[in-house]
Amino acid sequence: MKHIVQQIHFIGIGGAGMSGIAEVLLNLGYQVSGSDLAEGAVTKRLKGLGVVIHIGHDPKNIGTTEAVVISTAVAGNNPEVLAARAAKIPVIQRAVMLGELMRLKQGIAIAGTHGKTTTASLVASVLAEGGLDPTFVIGGKLNSAGANARLGRGDFIVVEADESDASFLQLFPAMEVVTNIDADHMDTYQHDMARLKQAFVQFIQRMPFYGVAVLCIDDANVRDIIPFVSQPVLRYGLSDDADIRAANVRADGTRMHFTVDRRTVRRHGNKPGPLNITLNLPGLHNVRNALAAIGIATELGVGDEAITKALSEFGGVGRRFQRYGEIPLDSGGSFTLIDDYGHHPVEMSATLAAARGAYPDRRLVLAFQPHRYTRTRDCFGEFVQVLRSFDALVLTDVYPAGEAKIPGADGKSLMKAAIAEEKNSKALLNSAAVAYAASITEMPEKLRQVLKDGDVLITMGAGSIFALPHTLSEAKHV
């Protein structure tokens, strides 16, 4: 590509998926520019690396670029898109550019409705500890690297494969992981689960004959598609028929301990033995994510010592059960602050279970911003069940992500339903422990009404709530 195109412009460069690709291309020697609506930590970092950053969208930003990269969040009437098309400059989707990057190395693509970022981070960390020095482009900041992307010298590139817009069908990886298949972004699949499953089968079939699909056998929908996959499959999970199987699982604060039985044969012919794992992450869902990384590493011949060391020393990922420490309360005492990206009921339930395991004797308080009206509508009942499983709750309205408002699928409706539900159940949540904030800026005041000494506060959501933990930690008290 480089002998034809040297200047590349990203519209919406501050997005997690876009910024990582931009950084790797810059390190490969391309001239990279980008624009975004607002300046943030990501754009500042990219600017410091040498990317030309424009704040705001303007046709002039296109300049002499030879290719323009957009995500599905960028509208077709964006002024820079219109200018590029008028000038006959190619406008390509983010997934297409990611696919071009993957042509340079052997791709390891992590797919699934939930857990992609953590699993990709674990895979990258284990391969790095094993001396394979991978390139990675992931959706969150890998704390050990201080970034969500890195150009390695090794033969492999670890990426996230996005099913939300079916763009994972643009990729041709050599190895794949599927963590789970759940009903989300169903507009893409005409609200048909069969179509969604078929898309994952198509994704797996894009691998070459020497590839391997590492699939979570614990997930019913993943199990359903295995008979339709012709490529080699490595099954992982806690199920008895898993090839990479965890057992003797126990929680120890924010760490998990378990043994791993590997019933596979390494590519170089030596049968791997059992492993004793200490994972520096909480929750059963992260045990499964670690098993996926163990499966990939085992297939690539990474040594057992490197696998166990990488998992025990894993530094975490930004906004995935990210711990901010203790925050003092004005009323006396303090609370523990944790931030998480979860925005689907399944993800929220997994985080809740991890928190209950890590902090079994403490109240769990949730500050939640729903994400997208369609998801709130489609998963309304599941959201209510999760919300009322916390001990206290502060809700705000839905982050629309460009969607039009849907009556009855908003924050106030969720709050009312969560309170009403308790009358017919043994839910822990009660109306005295619930508050509604009209905006994110009102949340600190509402939290003062519900937080008590010793509480664990989890801020959760995929929208503008990402700024709340920073606000709370910088204030040094609530």
From Swiss-Prot:
Pathway named in the protein's UniProt entry: Cell wall biogenesis; peptidoglycan biosynthesis
Subcellular location field: Cytoplasm
Entry binding sites for ATP: 112-118
Major localisation: cytoplasm
An annotated Gene Ontology molecular function: ATP binding
EC number: 6.3.2.8
Cellular component, GO, one term: cytoplasm
Pfam family, one: Mur_ligase
Classification via HAMAP family: MurC
Family: Belongs to the MurCDEF family.
Protein name per Swiss-Prot or TrEMBL: UDP-N-acetylmuramate--L-alanine ligase
Lineage start: Bacteria, Pseudomonadati, Pseudomonadota, Betaproteobacteria, Burkholderiales
Catalytic activity from the UniProt record: UDP-N-acetyl-alpha-D-muramate + L-alanine + ATP = UDP-N-acetyl-alpha-D-muramoyl-L-alanine + ADP + phosphate + H(+)
Gene: murC
Record key words, sorted: ATP-binding, Cell cycle, Cell division, Cell shape, Cell wall biogenesis/degradation, Cytoplasm, Ligase, Nucleotide-binding, Peptidoglycan synthesis
